[in-house]
């Protein structure tokens, strides 16, 4: 089951430090993202997130995210 919903504001740790963004899509089936196959399921969805600062898209598992206000 999904821990987050579209529109949630979240943050995650990247090699450049903490990044904040908004969840744009929730993937529950395998999907290719930026040239790599991402394994997704209803039990372990992956979240497509748009960075607040750069507008770039990232994809992460829920365990890598933290919901913020």
Model-derived segments and spans:
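Basic/aromatic-rich interaction segments and small domains that mediate binding to polyanionic partners
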Residues: 3-60, 68
